[in-house]
């Protein structure tokens, strides 16, 4: 965990800085009417930050295990140890990073006075499901990733596209093709 932020000036702040900058960008674009998001149930900055943090949690759950497996490739070949340990370590890293980001989300919710509802109390179930989904995709792609270095690069492009077709920065569409895509989108 500490190795992830070694040799950086900002260290763990990078976990918070990126989603804050992305949120500020989307809020700016929405306020300038460059994009028109429409109404949300909670203040738009809290909405966008929530979506961004959840998306980053999913993307981390998908990419972190693949990166750690790739980095441990030689060790996997030479040393006999439970290979599941790499996946468990990466899952721990994803959960700790996500927990740190959730503290930011809680602060923003308190700042904007977002009321505590039963939906928010059930959110941890959805969050765990989201992280497990990312880890499952990662497990499925791990063998291919070890054979072909392109898998991670294709995933990065795919995640960028998937971000925009997932209701992260906009409410779930109620009609049209976007609604159909959102309906079948597992994220």
Annotate each predicted stretch with a short phrase:
Residues 1-187:
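Hydrophobic transmembrane alpha-helices and immediately adjacent juxtamembrane helices
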């Amino acid at each position: 965990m500490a190795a992830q932020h070694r040799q950086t000036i900002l260290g763990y702040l990078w976990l918070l800085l990126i989603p804050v900058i992305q949120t500020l960008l989307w809020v700016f674009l929405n306020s300038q009417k460059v994009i028109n998001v429409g109404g949300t149930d909670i203040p738009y900055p809290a909405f966008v930050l929530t979506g961004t943090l959840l998306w980053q949690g999913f993307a981390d759950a998908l990419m972190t295990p693949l990166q750690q497996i790739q980095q441990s490739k030689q060790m996997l070949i030479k040393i006999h140890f439970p290979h599941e340990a790499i996946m468990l370590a990466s899952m721990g890293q994803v959960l700790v990073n996500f927990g740190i980001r959730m503290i930011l989300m809680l602060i923003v919710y308190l700042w904007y006075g977002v009321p505590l509802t039963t939906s928010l109390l059930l959110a941890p179930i959805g969050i765990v499901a989201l992280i497990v989904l990312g880890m499952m995709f990662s497990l499925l792609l791990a063998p291919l990733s070890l054979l072909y270095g392109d898998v991670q690069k294709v995933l990065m492009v795919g995640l960028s596209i998937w971000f925009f077709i997932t209701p992260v920065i906009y409410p779930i569409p109620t009609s049209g093709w976007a609604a159909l895509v959102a309906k079948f989108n597992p994220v």
